[in-house]
UniProtKB/Swiss-Prot annotation:
This is Proline/serine-rich coiled-coil protein 1. Required for normal progression through mitosis. Required for normal congress of chromosomes at the metaphase plate, and for normal rate of chromosomal segregation during anaphase. Plays a role in the regulation of mitotic spindle dynamics. Increases the rate of turnover of microtubules on metaphase spindles, and contributes to the generation of normal tension across sister kinetochores. Recruits KIF2A and ANKRD53 to the mitotic spindle and spindle poles. May participate in p53/TP53-regulated growth suppression. Belongs to the PSRC1 family. PANTHER family: DIFFERENTIAL DISPLAY AND ACTIVATED BY P53 DDA3 /G2 S PHASE EXPRESSED 1 (PTHR21584), PROLINE_SERINE-RICH COILED-COIL PROTEIN 1 (PTHR21584:SF1). It comes from Homo sapiens.
Length: 363
């Protein structure tokens, strides 16, 4: 216990003065007497008194005086500094040369910053693309072609969608016979004139003459637009599956003279029915009017003459058909021979107008 008490010392005689500007400081400093005690080794964590006025003992030996330098000393210092600077510069140049020789074959990595060069007099200018003022003002065709191609693709896709999904309505709206035979000008558009041709045929020679005049008028209309009528009839009446039948065999009438004389009348009626066919109508026509147009059609597939049966098997007789048509005394155009009676036959087989434009084999 006594040893512990000797090691532990309490700060009793030390006074802490926090009033540095108090007037009593100077008086107290004068009265304080310095107690000189033997020096002991300093210990950490304890406060010790220090005398600021105590001067450390100067080491005996060479004394260094830091006074003003004489001019001779200054000149020596300057000469030595210049010599050191020249030596350092020479060493730096040697290091640079050695580094340049070592890194010569290596390619320096370009900096990420973009570098710009003036190419007015450079030979590399010939390799660059030339830009003139005209090309700046007018856009190049290559920049316009992708837009046109994309528009063409869009148009083709729309056309394919329209033809695949809405074929019957588009065929009715866009068929050229609608423009060639308007409903207001053609006399065969009204339902009254539609039902009259069979009555005229029964009236006698005067009715036949009137029918022949109508046939000539229909020829003038159809001959100018035979190609368009053929195209529309080709879309509206696809060929049925089976052996191909020549279309002229339908025109070949029976060998009786009465049928050969009555031939121009059904052709006129068929021309009228073809002019009425492509007109789009959302309201279906009554079924009572349809047999009237089918009466004026030459014999269909069920009642074909033996000549037409032989032609169906693959032995066409265009000479006999043309000869019998000429006996009637009227020249029938090729487009009317090929397509118009088939139009009447399809009308007699398919009565509702919606089924006319449906692609596929007919009944």
């Amino acid at each position: 216990m006594e040893d512990l008490e000797e090691d532990v010392r309490f700060i009793v005689d030390e006074t802490l003065d926090f009033g540095g500007l108090s007037p009593s400081d100077s008086r107290e400093e004068e009265d304080i007497t310095v107690l000189v005690t033997p020096e002991k080794p300093l210990r950490r964590g304890l406060s010790h008194r220090s005398d600021p006025n105590a001067v450390a003992p100067a080491p005996q030996g060479v004394r260094l005086s830091l006074g003003p330098l004489s001019p001779e000393k200054l000149e020596e210092i300057l000469d030595e500094a210049n010599r050191l600077a020249a030596q350092l510069e020479q060493c730096a140049l040697q290091d640079r040369e050695s580094a340049g020789e070592g890194l010569g074959p290596r390619r320096v990595k370009p900096s990420p910053r973009r570098e710009t060069f003036v190419l007015k007099d450079s030979p590399v200018r010939d390799l660059l693309p030339t830009v003139n003022s005209l090309t700046r003002s007018t856009p190049s065709p290559s920049s316009l072609t992708p837009r046109l191609r994309s528009n063409d693709r869009k148009g083709s896709v729309r056309a394919l969608r329209a033809t695949s999904g809405k074929r019957p309505s588009n065929m009715k709206r866009e068929s050229p016979t609608c423009n060639l035979f308007p409903a207001s000008k053609s006399p065969a558009s009204s339902p009254l004139t539609r039902s009259t041709p069979p009555v005229r045929g029964r009236a006698g020679p005067s009715g036949r003459a009137a029918a022949s005049e109508e046939t000539r008028a229909a020829k003038l209309r159809v001959s100018g637009s035979g190609e368009f009528v053929g195209l529309t009839l080709k879309f509206l009446h696809p060929s049925p599956p089976g052996p191909p039948t020549p279309i002229r065999s339908v025109l070949a009438p029976q060998p009786s003279t009465s049928n050969s004389q009555r031939l121009p009348r059904p052709q006129g009626a068929a021309a009228k029915s073809s002019s009425q066919l492509p007109i789009p109508s959302a309201i279906p026509r009554p079924a009572s009017r349809m047999p009237l147009t089918s009466r004026s059609v030459p014999p269909g597939r069920g009642a074909l003459p033996p000549d037409s049966l032989s032609t169906r098997k693959g032995l066409p007789r265009p000479s006999t058909a043309g000869h019998r048509v000429r006996e009637s005394g009227h020249k029938v155009p090729v487009s009317q021979r090929l397509n118009l009676p088939v139009m009447g036959a399809t009308r007699s087989n398919l009565q509702p107008p919606r089924k006319v434009a449906v692609p596929g084999p007919t009944r």
